[in-house]
Amino acid sequence: MEEFQGYLELDIFRQHDFLYPLIFREYSXXXAHGHGLNRYMLLENIGYDNKSSLLIVKRLITTMYQQNYLIISANDSKQNPFFGYNKNLHSKILSEGFAIIVEIPFYLRLISSLEGAEIVRFYNLRSIHSIFPFLEEKFPHLNYSADILIPYPAHLEILVQTLRYRVKDASYLHLLRFFLHEYSNCNSLIITNKSISIFSKSNPRFFLFLYNSYICEYESIFLFLRNQSSHLRLTSSGVLFERLCLYRKIEHFAEVFANDFPVIPCFLKDPFMHYVRYQGKSILASKDTPLLMNKWKSYLVNLWQCHFDVWSHAASIRINQLSKHSLDFLSYFSSVRRNPAVVRNQMLENSFLLNNAPNKLDTIVPIIPLIGSLAKAKFCNAVGHPISKLTRADLSDFEIINRFLHICRNLSHYYSGSSKKKNMYRIKYILRLSCVKTLARKHKSTARAFLKRVDSEFFQEFFTEEGGFISLIFPRASFALRRLYSGRVWYLDIIFINGLSNHE
C-alpha cells in the first residue's frame, strides 16, 4: 500500500476522488456510455499471475478501449460472453483490479484514523472468538436482545447511491455502474438471491467492497442514533470513515422520526445498549424494558425504508428475553442462565450459608443444524448415523484419515468455547465412524472386520482426545490445569467460520 500513497496528493480526509481515475479517467466514461461500439469481444485465454499489478489492468483497459471491445447493452447482455458468469479472463482481471484500486483510499484512511491508537497492536481482535469474551462480560447483566438480519438492497443502484454520500467522483460511479450492469439485469426492479449468489462467488472482493460500503453507511447512522440515546459516548465510533453531508442527513432523519413518533419525539436514554455484528447478522442487547427495544426496532425499520429504499418488515427483528431464549449467532446457541452457587460465610462464632445465583453466558453447540451440515456433506444420514463417504480410489489410507482428522480438529477448535462438550463428542463420533466406514468400503470389507484387521496404533492419532495432549506434553500437569482445558477456551486465531459450522 505504501507504493500507492504518492498518488494521493490531497489530504486523504478531504479527497473526493478515488485513486483509479488518475490512471483510467479517460476510459471510464466511454466504458459506461459506449453503446455504439462494435460488438466484438476479446476471448483469448492468456495466462496471468494471480497477483496482477495495476499496470496489467491499465494495459488491458487500453487495449480493449482501442480495439472497441468495451460494450454495454441491455439488449444483448445475456449473449455477452465477456462478462456473463465472469468466467472470462479479462473480466476477472479488470474487476479484481478495480476492487483493489478502490480499496486503497479506504485503507489509508483507516490507517490514518488508527495512527497512534493502541488498538492497532491487538491483531487478535480480528478473531471471531474475540467477540465471545465481550458477550460473557456484558450479556449476563442485560435483559433483552434483538436478533437483527440486515436486509440486502432491493437493487444494485442503491449501492451506487450509497457510495455517492462518501465519494464525489462521477467517473468512479460510471465505471461502477458498468460492472453492476453486466452482473445483473438493470431492468429488473429487484435482485434475486440467485443473482446475488452468482455475483458474490464470481468476484468476492468486488462484492465485499460494495457490501461493506453499504454496511458502513448503515452503521454510521445507527451509531450516531445510538450516541444520541446514551449518556456515554462510544470510543470506537472514531474509526468510521468520513461521510459527506452526514449531519444534514441525520437532521432529516430526526424530522422523519419526529413525524412518525409525534408522542415521543426524543430518544430514550439507555447507557446499557450493546451492539454486535458479524457479516449480515447483528444483535442489539439492552438492560432496559421491551418498550425501548420496540422503539429501536421501529427506528431500524424506518432507517432501511427511508434511507436505503429497502423494504423490511418489523417481523424480521425478533426481540427476546435473554433468560428464556437462545441466540443463534456465530454458529453457537448462546443464552443467559443462572449459575447457582453456595458460599459459606463465618463471622466470629456464627457461620451461615449464602445462596448466590449469578447470571452466566451459556454457549452450546447447535447439534441439529450441525448434523444437517454433516448429512449434506455425506458424512451421515439425516438422523446422524455415520455413513461411508465417496473418495478417490488413488487416495491412500493415511490421506483419508488425515482429511477426516483435519475436519475433526477444525470443528473441535472452533467449538472449544462450548460450555457443554457432549454435543461435540457426538460430532466427533460421527466423523470417526464415517472414516472407518470409508476405509472399510475402500478395502471391500465391513467396519468391524476392518478394525480387527488393522493395527491398534493405526487410528491412535485420530482417536486421541484433545485433552489427552495435555497429559502427553505435561505428564505431571496439575488438576487445575486439566480442568481449565476441559472448560471453555476461546482461540484468537480464528478469522472465519468453518464451512460445516456455517449453517446460517
Swiss-Prot record:
- Which keywords, in A-to-Z order, does the entry hold? Chloroplast, mRNA processing, Plastid, RNA-binding, tRNA processing
* Chief subcellular location: plastid
Give a GO molecular function annotation for the protein.
RNA binding
Report the locations given in the UniProt record.
Plastid, Chloroplast
Q: Name one Pfam family in it.
A: Intron_maturas2
GO cellular component terms, A-Z: chloroplast
Q: Which GO terms describe its biological process?
A: mRNA processing; RNA splicing; tRNA processing
Q: Tell me where on the tree of life, at the top rank, the source sits.
A: Eukaryota
What function is annotated for this protein? Usually encoded in the trnK tRNA gene intron. Probably assists in splicing its own and other chloroplast group II introns.
By sequence similarity, the record places it as follows: Belongs to the intron maturase 2 family. MatK subfamily.
Protein name stated in the entry: Maturase K
Tell me the organism's taxonomic lineage: Eukaryota, Viridiplantae, Streptophyta, Embryophyta, Tracheophyta
